[in-house]
């Protein structure tokens, strides 16, 4: 069912990609055999088309600095703001280029933070699922898994290996998603290595909600199809950004607030506004997300796994969860993690509760409470 839903969304561009695949496939196989004869191999590393600030980037940097004997290549769009930075570290392949096609087909391992790292997701992914392509694919993940997602079932991705960032997550994936025991590896996340040298700004607050499948163009639709600005998601978060009590507290204490949408929701970033100059709506590539996590003193999120990164640095946060039932029904079903029993901060269903905890945390000099510190 999962694969069929993806195939139903094929476009003319996808059909062109299939044609390109059938042209490049025999060349890629021949090149792979040539490398095998020469006893050579390489790894292909990436995140998404424009990204280089997550586990893929940090793993690539580690390989280039400390494991130079192994050839690695990073795949990135030439227009990415990170392109020159990554190019200084090691070898970069332009996303979508013929070289990307060739190397994807001939790499010993494809290592990515996303399930889709090929030149054409709709071309390669079904062929990987049915076994036509049997390349080794390693999923670095882009955060610690907290909820259950259908896409992570082994039958829906045929991943060779999945990396885990936390022990409970590791045990959960081993038992619940159909992977062999050796395919699930607990190493921690590469990006966590960069969270030890943080220097926080005492007056910086970040708001980082995750996405909603029913509000994204390529997501799974639910029965409610409405204009985005009529959605509860928009009303709650935009309401927080313009709440009189919130603005008064922020301005009175000279706090700076940055609102940073998940990449899947960035299409709606222009819909959000605030009447306070202390509150800034951030576009995806205007700020580096990891730097924001390191600099901020307090976080407001909803269900996002960035809360784990924040708790890793022993910083306070709150989960603003106004749509719990709908989220569990249409986006990510409840897994091993309970936000109430295992979370790194309290949960709130309304703006007033969020503001109340923010004030409490501010009075405590943004120190993480003992209960949540023990959980972290």
Where are the regions a protein language model picked out?
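Conserved catalytic-core segment of nucleotide-activated headgroup transferases in glycan assembly
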Residues: 54-60, 64, 190-271, 348
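Active-site and donor-binding regions of nucleotide-sugar-utilizing enzymes
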Residues: 42-195
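Short active-site oxyanion
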Residues: 69-73, 157-162, 256-257, 295-298, ...
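Catalytic binding pocket for nucleotide-activated donors in carbohydrate/polymer assembly enzymes
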Residues: 271-276, 303-376
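Donor nucleotide-activated moiety binding/catalytic core segment of transferases
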Residues: 94-102, 263-308
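A short, gly/pro- and small-residue-rich
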Residues: 123-143, 224-235, 315-326
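Membrane-proximal basic amphipathic "stem/tether" segments
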Residues: 1-47
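Short loop/turn segments at strand-loop or loop-helix junctions that form parts
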Residues: 46-47, 108, 113-115, 141-143, ...
């Amino acid at each position: 069912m999962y694969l069929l839903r993806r195939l139903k969304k094929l476009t003319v561009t996808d059909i062109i990609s299939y044609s390109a695949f059938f042209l490049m496939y025999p060349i890629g196989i021949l090149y792979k055999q040539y490398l095998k004869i020469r006893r050579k191999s390489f790894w292909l590393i990436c995140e998404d088309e424009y990204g280089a600030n997550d586990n893929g980037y940090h793993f690539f940097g580690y390989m280039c600095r400390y494991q130079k004997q192994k050839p690695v290549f990073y795949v990135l769009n030439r227009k990415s703001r990170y392109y020159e930075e990554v190019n200084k570290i090691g070898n970069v392949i332009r996303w979508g280029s013929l070289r990307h096609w060739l190397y994807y087909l001939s790499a010993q391992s494809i290592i990515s933070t996303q399930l889709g790292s090929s030149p054409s997701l709709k071309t390669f992914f079904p062929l990987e699922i049915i076994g036509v392509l049997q390349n080794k694919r390693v999923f670095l993940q882009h955060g610690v898994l907290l909820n259950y997602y259908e896409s992570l079932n082994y039958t829906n991705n045929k991943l060779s290996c999945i990396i885990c960032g936390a022990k409970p997550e590791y045990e959960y994936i081993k038992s619940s998603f159909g992977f062999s025991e050796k395919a699930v590896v607990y190493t921690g996340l590469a990006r966590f290595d960069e969270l030890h040298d943080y220097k926080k700004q005492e007056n910086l607050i970040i708001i980082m909600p995750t996405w909603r499948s029913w509000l994204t163009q390529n997501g799974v639709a639910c029965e409610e199809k409405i204009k985005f600005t009529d959605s509860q998601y928009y009303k709650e978060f935009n309401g927080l950004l313009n709440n009189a009590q919130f603005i008064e507290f922020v301005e009175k204490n000279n706090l700076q607030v940055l609102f940073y949408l998940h990449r899947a929701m960035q299409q709606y970033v222009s819909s959000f506004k605030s009447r306070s100059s202390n509150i800034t709506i951030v576009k995806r590539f205007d700020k580096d997300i990891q730097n924001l996590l390191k600099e901020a003193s307090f976080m407001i999120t909803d269900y996002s796994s960035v809360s784990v990164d924040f708790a890793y640095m022993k910083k306070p946060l709150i989960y603003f969860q106004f749509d719990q039932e709908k989220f569990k029904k249409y986006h990510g079903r409840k897994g091993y993690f309970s936000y109430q029993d295992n979370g790194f901060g309290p949960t709130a269903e309304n703006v007033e509760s969020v503001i109340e905890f923010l004030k409490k945390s501010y009075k405590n000099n943004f120190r993480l409470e003992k209960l949540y510190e023990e959980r972290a």
